[in-house]
Amino acid sequence: MKRSLLFSIALALPIAASAFEGYAEVDGINYYILTKGAYAEVAQKNGGYEGDVVIPSSIEYDGVICSVTAIRQGAFSYSSKLTNVVIPSTVTSIGVQAFMNSKLKSVYIPSSVLSLGNSAFSGCDSLQSVKVDNLESWCSIEIGNNACPLQYAKHFYVGDEEIRHLTIPSSISVVNSRTFHGYKGLESVTFENGVTSIGDFAFYECSNLESVKMSNTITEIGKYVFYSCTSLNELKLSDELPSIKESCFQECTTLSSLYVPNSINEIGNKAFYKCKNLKKIIFGKCLKKIGTMAFSDCGELTDVYSFAEVSPVFGNMYYTASTLPFSGSYPEYATLHVPENSISDYQANPVWKVFGNIVALTEEELGIKEVKDESNETSIYTLDGRTSNAAIRGFNIVKSSNGKTRIVFMK
């Protein structure tokens, strides 16, 4: 028995001794290989990579089949002659600066990839197209700072479908941070019921995005989500959203009207800062707090409607004239419409007393009178300017045949 055990150990010794850990080139691709763990990671190559690179799902080294599981830090960075890369479904991570400043033109990222390291695709200004398997996997990927390839890509494909008008289906509950960061091919996004949250920077600088429609299942949106979406002109917020966070819609310079639903009780710092074309704002009745410079530098502002019986307060303990929510928006030339019994409260509040004209909401605006659909006398529009056959629940724009226009809230 003892002799048999010694013989078994002797057989195992050469195998252990031959285990390899280090860098080696196989079929033109450099890898970090660990034969003991039977895995390999694509690594940087002297002089960089050229042309089309198809990464295999596995390689053989020293008689061991090793699965290719990752693209290491800086692997393809500064590869000035690189064109296309196909990544196998065995790869789960793409490392920090993996493709940074390369001349990559197209890349396929499989659903197996769970993370993109910081600056993974930074400076890839030759990138034409990105292709992924499905939205479910793409919306769940963890994307580091300045790592999203879509900020450079002209085309984004889910399967064989190019995405310009995006629908986030009910099968996706969370859209992770930076998922569509900087994608200039995106023109509209609609969220179906079932989506609950949108991460920070998710649609940051999508400069051609014109329309955003949120389902009422969304209860959280992060910071800087729609920052500098400079073409955004149609916005429908979730009726279950409790707050709008810091810089969420900052520099959405085309947005002209805004309806803040009753569910929202707080608006964060610079949430709508520099929305330079914003003319009309309607705040629901539950708003309690507005942050620093939330609506600053909105120089076209003419009318603000607040349905809160108690005037919302400034979100910070200390303030100066330049940090108040409407600083730089010339509120002294705008009209604030508030509940009649609350006028004195608003006049005493530093957030609101800066308005040059504070008036009572009319009965129609308060929804006391019913709006009748008489097509020969009135035209009814939604807040985003679409015509409606009848007044709908919530806010309506009603234009009478005599030229008078008013905003009406229907309960």
Which residues fall in each region the model found?
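Short, conserved loop/helix-junction motifs that constitute active-site signature segments
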Residues: C298, Y318-E332
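Short, surface-exposed loop/turn motifs with a glycine/proline- and acidic-biased composition
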Residues: Y61, T382-N402
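Consensus positions within tandem repeat domains that build extended binding/scaffold surfaces
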Residues: R72-A75, G95-A98, G117-A120, N145, ...
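Residue-level detector of functionally pivotal "anchor" positions at catalytic/ligand-binding pockets or at interdomain
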Residues: L361-D384
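Boundary of Sec targeting at the N-terminus
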Residues: A19-E21
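Structural signature of tandem-repeat unit edges
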Residues: T35, G48-A70, S80-S93, N101-S115, ...
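N-terminal signal peptide c-region/cleavage motif recognized by signal peptidases
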Residues: P14-A16
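C-terminal tail/sorting-segment detector
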Residues: M1-R3, F395-K411
